[in-house]
Amino acid sequence: MKTRYSVLSVAMTAAFYTQYAQADLREQCLLGVPHFQGEEVTGDQTMMPIEIEADNAVINQPKDATYTGDVAIKQGNRSLFADEVRVEQNGEQERRAFLKGSYRYQDNLVQAHGRDAAMDLGSETAELQNTEFQLVGRQGRGTAESGLFNHNKRILKNATFTACLPNDNAWSIEGNEMIQHIDEEYAEIWHARFKVLGMPVFYSPYLQFPIGDRRRSGLLIPNFHRSSKDGFAYSQPFYWNIAPNMDATITPTYYSRRGWQISPEYRYLTKLGEGIVAGEYIGKDRLDEYRPDDNDRKRYLMHWRHNMSFLTGWRLYVDYTKVSDKRYFSDFDSEYGSSTDGYATQQFKLGYYQPNYNLSISGKKFQTFDELDVGPYRVLPQIDFNYYNDELVKGGDFKLFAQTARFENDSKLMPKAWRFHVEPTLNFPLANRYGSLNFETKLYATHYLQEKGSSKQADDMDKNVTRIIPQVKVDLQTVLEADKQLFKGFNQTFEPRVQYVYRPYKDQSNIGSGLNQSVSFGYDSALLQSDYFSLFNDRRYSGLDRISSANLITAGGTNRFFNEKTGVEVFNFSIGQTYYLSPSKIDDLSQNSTTKRSSSWALESNWKFHRKWNWHGAYQYDTRLNQTSLANTSLQYKPSQDKLVQLSYRFASKDYINQNLRSNTYGQDIKQVGAVVGWELTDRVAFMASHYHDIALKKPVESQLSVNYNTCCWSANVYVARKLTATPIGSPDTINDLYYDNKFGVNFELRFGTNYSSGVRKMLKKGMIPYTEQYGIN
């Protein structure tokens, strides 16, 4: 009988057997580079005294002197060692040292050795012949037939350079002339030949590369992958360091089944703010499965993110993402969106902020990827005003929120509207060492100016709608500490909370159209998803178009356990439920009303039973349907930042999905298990493996395996992945018809002594379902 092992099980086993990696890679790499001995001195080196030591000296004052036998010349931070040195002096104007035979030169930035050299003792300049050099305190070494070294520049002839340690010739760059700019931390090279293991693989008439922490313009290492959908793909990124405050990366990619894609990305930091502008473009997608229109097969993405603070109190925020079609994120991996998001956001906000008030104008639009007859509304403009004053009423905190918004929809069936909203709130908080009591009154006052859709089939609308709803809320909280320990070594607290909310009923069916209830109610309201903490929200719906009636009591509590010695929280458990004294509704339709006297039970818990172990669980029981509506749990072992194992499970009933997503076509429960391993096996090898499986469908959702190999001067990543993808056009699209994209890829990275990461965190971010942490105790 043969035994079968999954990739993930082998990966998890390997992880547990390599809990102790070798010494940190950075420490190992820096052990292989020279370090400056002694104390660095600052100031003009040429004005510092010259110390000369030698076994013998022949001095011909005042013109020259010849020193032989273990000669050492020291001035400031630089030293020169040779068998024979002749020093010539021309009055006080010039002092030069000439070295015959082998020599060693060192300062606080570089060490070198070779044959024959000259050093100007009055200008910090050294001319070195047939030299081998190595940077001090960082990776970088090379050779040159001749070199002119000074305090801010090294000019090398017929030179080589590599960031690899001695005796490691993994890669190198050769050129007829190389100029190393010390302060700017980059090098220029002419007629550059890039070699791997001594074999030339690339030529460029001119090239720049970093010799420090700052990035420089030039070609980056290409990436390769092959997938069942794209075919073979080759990416060649080019980095452009435009200025100290702005740069760009331009990446052409060739897909054998799709054609050429160009992906520019521009990053900036100016007085007008900081942000990123990016794009992805294919002029004509050749893939036969993609046939929306044979005359228009362009695929593109546009992205702009901007943050700006200016004058006093002014802020501007822009987040704009637009794609050519609904399938874009299913077909292409992108940093600017994912197929699991379901939409792309296009929004901006300009605001003025002061300590007790703020004013903003904004706009927002969603590009959805679902097949919907009627999409969500766009809002432009939206003007918000917030005002705070805790001295207006004695013992009370006054707050005022006001908004004006304009809503429009692409569908001619849908109405347009202006919404004017005012929401004053008055809080009376009371608190002492036993707990807190907050009494709140609020008024929702809203007026709508509605315009019927332009289509003849559009619903008739009330042109003017006014809605005024008062609200009263009482919130009581306290913290009780147990006198006795339930478990030895752990102190226990219980935090009960009771909240009462009252709002009268107002029929709101005349606000907006019922045609888009698969997306929202009215113009921007949707039923909120619930968990323990959302039980204490004032409202069941987001936005302002649906404010349900309320006559309810919410009761809950959190039990916490703390380590008696350290005071650190190790366990908590929360449970709560809402009790409806009368049905909560927004109109006369039964499906939009609470029919039971109580809501779902909501439970949430976190347990850190060891500093390396975390557990989280959440559960909701629907009392209306007498069944579980939501559940999720995850267990994580994380001994360090680059070592973790996580197991997870999530469940959502089809009734809960249908209630919260009217356009749902899933037709059954979601039952999904997942496992993720990210582990630094040694200082050089790390891997990530993940697998998500749908129990209901009995089919995988996504599987990944990625291995990273790191050295001091390069790293390589090899990965395989299999994930669900969009249904090809013209193919069957039922619950049992699932389509996968299989991918294999290789990425290389040159390291110039500035990046020693294992790559685990980068690998964890990849995939359709990226790794997340949701633990309430850290």
From Swiss-Prot:
Coiled-coil regions in this chain? none
User: Where does the source fall among the domains of life?
Assistant: Bacteria
| Keywords, ordered alphabetically | Cell outer membrane, Membrane, Signal
User: Where is the signal peptide, in residue numbers?
Assistant: 1-23
CC annotations in GO: cell outer membrane; transporter complex
Nucleotide-binding as UniProt keyword: no
What Gene3D superfamilies does the database record attribute to this sequence?
Answer: Lipopolysaccharide (LPS) transport protein A like domain
Q: Where in the cell is it found?
A: Cell outer membrane
The reply on keyword Acetylation is no
List the InterPro entries.
LipoPS_assembly_LptD, LptD, LptD_C, OstA-like_N
Name the principal localization, coarsely classed.
membrane
Any one GO BP annotation for this protein: lipopolysaccharide transport
- Entry's family note: Belongs to the LptD family.
- Role description: Together with LptE, is involved in the assembly of lipopolysaccharide (LPS) at the surface of the outer membrane.
UniProt xrefs under HAMAP family: LPS_assembly_LptD (MF_01411)
Its assembly, as annotated, is: Component of the lipopolysaccharide transport and assembly complex. Interacts with LptE and LptA.
Name under which the protein is recorded: LPS-assembly protein LptD
Source species of the chain: Actinobacillus pleuropneumoniae serotype 3 (strain JL03)
